[in-house]
Each structure stands twice: as structure tokens, then as C-alpha cells.
Swiss-Prot record:
It comes from the Eukaryota. It holds the Pfam family DAO_C. This is Glycerol-3-phosphate dehydrogenase SDP6, mitochondrial. Pathway: Polyol metabolism; glycerol degradation via glycerol kinase pathway; glycerone phosphate from sn-glycerol 3-phosphate (anaerobic route): step 1/1. It catalyses: a quinone + sn-glycerol 3-phosphate = dihydroxyacetone phosphate + a quinol.
Amino acid sequence: MSLASIRRLAAGAAVIAAASGGAVYLSPSVASSDKGGGPILDSLRRRLGDPTASVPSRSAQESALIAATASDPLDVLVIGGGATGSGVALDAVTRGLRVGLVEREDFSSGTSSRSTKLIHGGVRYLEKAVFNLDYGQLKLVFHALEERKQLIENAPHLCHALPCMTPCFDWFEVIYFWMGLKMYDLVAGPRLLHLSRYYSAKESIELFPTLARKGKDKNLRGTVVYYDGQMNDSRLNVGLACTAALAGAAVLNHAEVVSLITDDATKRIIGARIRNNLTGQEFNSYAKVVVNAAGPFCDSIRKMIDEDTKPMICPSSGVHIVLPDYYSPEGMGLIVPKTKDGRVVFMLPWLGRTVAGTTDSNTSITSLPEPHEDEIQFILDAISDYLNIKVRRTDVLSAWSGIRPLAMDPTAKSTESISRDHVVFEENPGLVTITGGKWTTYRSMAEDAVDAAIKSGQLKPTNECVTQKLQLLGSYGWEPSSFTTLAQQYVRMKKTYGGKVVPGAMDTAAAKHLSHAYGSMADRVATIAQEEGLGKRLAHGHPFLEAEVAYCARHEYCESAVDFIARRCRIAFLDTDAAARALQRVVEILASEHKWDKSRQKQELQKAKEFLETFKSSKNAQFNDGKHN
């Protein structure tokens, strides 16, 4: 860090401030997105606020897709059940359109469950905007800030503000980062979560006890802290899909598109041939427009029309690791501002553990990507320079890789320079493809895709987009203190076994977990725990209850053991060995819910074990409640 960098930052800040002017506080999408809705939105909000409301059954959803014939098609058929695809389904159905969605695996089974768990407010775009005097990058900052704010408000039980600390071992670094983040505060305006601030070295150590006092022969001068958003990504994705289902969309996971249907006369895409991967049954489902939101696999959908289609996806691998809770204090993240190859690495508290990452490298597209050992070691090396504790490979509880579907730029030489922004295009009539983007902006991406679908199919929505102000399932009536109701009602419950009275398994930690994972639906899970004898924990040291398996099977389209351990409950991501120990009981409960025979139970166990093998934990490490023994 140099004086020249600080001068350049100051000069760029002045130009950006002058260029943006009053637009800093402008939020043009709010007014347009808050219009309309009418009876459709009113009805949905009543269902979302009804604690007894349930999504349609899986068989009913499949029947609705089959009922979409050539003479009576859907308005929109979405391929892909990740954040973008589920967002498209929710946007379209709340505009009064007839909507279907199919996902070949599970909601959030791909990239959407393998994120850094951050809802970025575009702080890195601001740095590029300042140094490159790029107003386009500044607009991305405005957009990310607005979408972050709305996402946190629309799913408050799953999203929250998180302070992130940047260590400074040079006074120039202190000035540089402080100036940059104060400019960020100014640009954020009413979208700001909390003001950034400087902490002295002593204050920083009190806030983050494992922070290194020295780095590269320099003493810690202090830290600069700003706030970003954090989320439970896959549960947010499942919430999107279930909200869309409650609104009337026919959503079906474990349903794969095997081919697209083309009108022989017009050559327009008019539907898809779909295979139910649980039963093997195939059927046609027709639609006026098909939206390809298959993430890293969107090129494979495009190639169903033309095998020679030029790829639009540049796949990038992002690896994360999970460490015990003592690596980071609860409620404070750490940013490694520059690794040996110039990247940024985050170390964040998440669901009682610490998640660290990520990497950024070219990769091939696969349904179950695996982290390489050198990528895991890269992250460990990056954080070790900033911590005063020994960072060990044996502390890794879980490690996973996700594939970012970056929009291809043929002139780019590395994935870091390829745009993270999204692209919507229609190269074949009737097939709208959306790719790129990031979790933070999924909602506006979906809005753009639905706008394109309406134009393509000359559809007639009953109202404009309403998703900006639409709270998701579990959000209505939820408060941060909602867990206390669960604690007071269920913590002291007693059960009698053979005349011996023992306390129920639910404690305050479990009550907090249920409240944040399920929001206002948590009471239904607690009731199952109490009334059906499913109050035991699935794995020691984790708050997940047996009742969650039953609830997710009944109300969240949980159709496999992997669906549960990876995406309904996050135990596979948090602690691979604990997930393996919980597997048998998870399969037993799912078997009871779905009437599986012994053969199916054996298959589920094997598939789940193979899935867990892709999470590179430390087999020789022994943990208890996230602490190393």
C-alpha cells in the first residue's frame, strides 16, 4: 500500500461522487416493483401467513406438469431449481402466469448451495469503479446494495447483517481501507446495514481474539470493519421454491429434461420431455416459453437444439472449507485482503462453525465437483498469516467445491476478469436462457428473465413484478426473539419412558436453530418433535432434530437422504463425519415417511455415503461441539 494509491483513491472518490450526484440515493426499481399484485398477491400473503398452510404434494405437482398439453400449455416452464430458476418461477407465478419448474436433482443441489454464504453489497465493485473511473461498476454497486437490502428484509430468519474485519499492518492500509469504506457508506445511503468504523489494535484483539498481533514483521495497526449480509443459502433456495409452490407454480425436483420439444412448422421451442428420476416415468410438458436457468449446465440444454452451439459458460471452481468455531468469534468475520496471488479470502462464523474461502480457478463441469488438496491448503495458508493459532489440515471438518456459471467473455484470459453479471438472451425462439450473476442479485435476474419470457411468448401477466417486497415462506410474523416462544413451550417438555421421566431433547440451541432455519414454520417442527417422539438430536454437537426430517419430507419436497443432510439441514457442509453418523437415522425416518422398502433404504445410504466422500474432511480428526480434542 502506497501514498500514490491513497491519492488515487481520493481522486477517484471525488470523480465518482460528482458523477453519481443525487443518484447515490436513487432506487428506481422500488416504485415499479411495489405496484400491482392484486388478488393473486393478497391470496399468497394469506397462505404465507397461515401456519397450517402446506405446499401441494409431489404427485399433484407432477400431474399439473403433465396436464400442460399442446392445446393448453403453461405460460412458462423453468429448467433449473437453483436460486435463479426458483426466483424465475416465483416472479412469473406472482405476475399471474401459469408456471412449471423442473430440477433434475434437488432445489439448490448445485452452485446455489455451495456459496460463501455472503449477500454481497458490491464493495469490490466500488474499488474498481474508483480506480478505473467506471460508472458502470458504480451502477453495479447501487444494484447490489438495493438487492442485498431487500433480500434480508424478505427472508429475515435466513439472512442477517454480519460485520467483517479487515486487518491492517501498515498505517497506509488503515487510511486506504478506511477511506474506501467511508465512501461505501456514502454510496450506500439508506441501503447501508451499519456504518463502517476503525478499531485500534487492542480493540481488534478483544473483538477477534485469534487475530495475529504481527504480520510479515509488522505490528497490527488496527482493523477496519464494514457490514455485509450473510445467509443460509440452500434453505433460502428451498424457501423460494416452496413459496412459488404455494403461489401456484408446479415445481418438481428430481425431474430431468431429456429433450426439448420443437414445433415442426415454426421451429419454436414449445415444451420439454421430462423424466421423473425417482420413478423413471417420462412425460411431455408444453409451454409458451421455456426458460433455461440450469446454471453451469445451461449449455447442455442449449445443445439439445444444436450440438454445435458455442458455449456461453466459463466454469470457475470455488472451494470452501469449514473449521471449528474457535477459529472465529461468533458475530464477526475476517477478510484476508490480499493473498499471495492477489485474491480475497473470507473467514466467517456460520451456523456454529467457521467457513473459509474461496478459490477461483478454471474447472470442468460436473454434477459433484470435488475440492483439490492444493486448493484446501491454499485457503489454510491464506488465513494462517492473519491468525495467532496454528492452522491445521486436521481441523478441516468439511470442504466442498462449487461451480460458478460465469458468463463467457472470449477476450478474457482468467476467470477473475470475466463478468459476474448476468446475461439473458433468446437465440432460439421460445427458449430464453439466463446465466451468470450471483446470489445477491437472483431476484432482479429472475425479473429480467421473466420480462424476456413475456416478450418472447407475448404473454399476458395480470400485474407487474412484485417480488421486491414479497416475503418468503417462514418470514411472516417472524421476529429475532421468536425462538423464545419455542423455548418456553417445548424446552421443559417431559416424556415418560418405562416410568422414568427424562427431559425432552430440545434446548435453547435447538430452539434458536429451528427458529432461524424454518422461521414461523418452526412451531410445526417442534410439534412433530413433541407429539411424535422425534425430539432427539441427529448428531452429537449439532442442534438438528429428528423431527426436521419428517417435516421436510412432508412440507419441503425432501425426497432423498442427500436432500436432507445437504440442503434442508446443513450438516453435510458443517461436519462431514457427523453427517455420516446421522445417516442411518435420517434414512429410517424418510423410509417411514415415503414408504421405502429395504432395497431403497440401502440405495439411499450408499448414495449419501458417496456424496459425503466428495467433501474432503479430515478423517483422522476428532471433534466435539466444534472443538478439537
